[in-house]
């Protein structure tokens, strides 16, 4: 049998699989897509040192009931780089989809606080600040049913090099938060939560 140490290790392994990535689909990003709405979300880290968390910006595009996560910008950036990346991500979305994102959701913590202040001062981006008021597991649990709306790009375009790491991070997310990184999970949570509260079923009008 397993000793206590072995049993604890086994329980830790089992503690993954909070997010069922099997329900996430794919879309053909080789074809031009028309979207109803585009939003961006950002999860920012405290610093750019190599042990720090990553800062992440996600581009989420709504088409009917589907949510296409079309691009992830991810890196360890200093504040000026973070600000530049945020503006670049917004402009990339405008140029790519000929649609101005309606909301740029930024978590009001770490460097996100200063980022919100600076972007408000320097730009006219549609900023929306969010303050996390629950632990990460509770937050993610509240949107688990929304993951089936999520679709990822299927082509081997180098811009999609983030997809495999993204799925790995989702799979590794644990209730006890002993996973290595959850910056892409956080970005996804904010998008799914925001869009779930704003989705309208057309059957309501029939």
Please place each PLM-identified region on the residue numbering.
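Acidic two-metal-ion nuclease catalytic site recognized across multiple nuclease folds
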Residues: 1-6, 14, 189-206
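ATPase catalytic-site recognition across NTP-hydrolyzing enzymes
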Residues: 1-44
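A generic fold-level signal
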Residues: 33-34, 52, 182
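Mg2+-dependent endonuclease catalytic cores in nucleic-acid-processing enzymes, primarily RNase H-like
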Residues: 37-39, 56-176
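An active-site-proximal beta-strand-loop segment
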Residues: 42-55
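Generic detector of well-ordered alpha-helical packing
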Residues: 44, 108, 183-187
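Hydrophobic positions within alpha-helical membrane elements
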Residues: 48, 112, 188-191
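Charged alpha-helix within mobile-element recombinases
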Residues: 166-193
């Amino acid at each position: 049998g397993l000793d206590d140490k072995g049993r604890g290790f086994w329980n830790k392994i089992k503690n993954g699989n909070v997010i069922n990535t099997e329900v996430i689909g794919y879309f053909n990003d080789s074809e031009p897509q028309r979207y109803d709405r585009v939003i961006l979300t950002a999860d920012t880290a405290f610093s750019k040192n190599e042990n720090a968390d990553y800062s992440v910006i996600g581009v989420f595009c709504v088409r009917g009931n589907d949510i296409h996560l079309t691009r992830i910008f991810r890196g360890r950036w200093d504040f000026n780089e973070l600000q530049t990346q945020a503006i670049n991500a917004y402009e990339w979305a405008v140029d790519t989809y000929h649609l101005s994102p309606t909301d740029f959701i930024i978590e009001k913590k770490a460097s996100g606080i200063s980022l919100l202040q600076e972007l408000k001062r320097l730009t006219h981006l549609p900023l929306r600040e969010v303050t996390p008021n629950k632990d990460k597991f509770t937050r993610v649990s509240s949107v688990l049913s929304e993951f089936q709306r999520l679709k990822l790009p299927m082509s081997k375009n180098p811009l999609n090099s983030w997809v495999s790491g993204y799925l790995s991070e989702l799979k590794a997310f644990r209730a006890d938060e002993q996973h290595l990184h959850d910056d892409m999970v956080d970005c996804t949570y904010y998008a799914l939560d925001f869009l779930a509260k704003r989705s309208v079923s057309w059957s309501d009008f029939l």
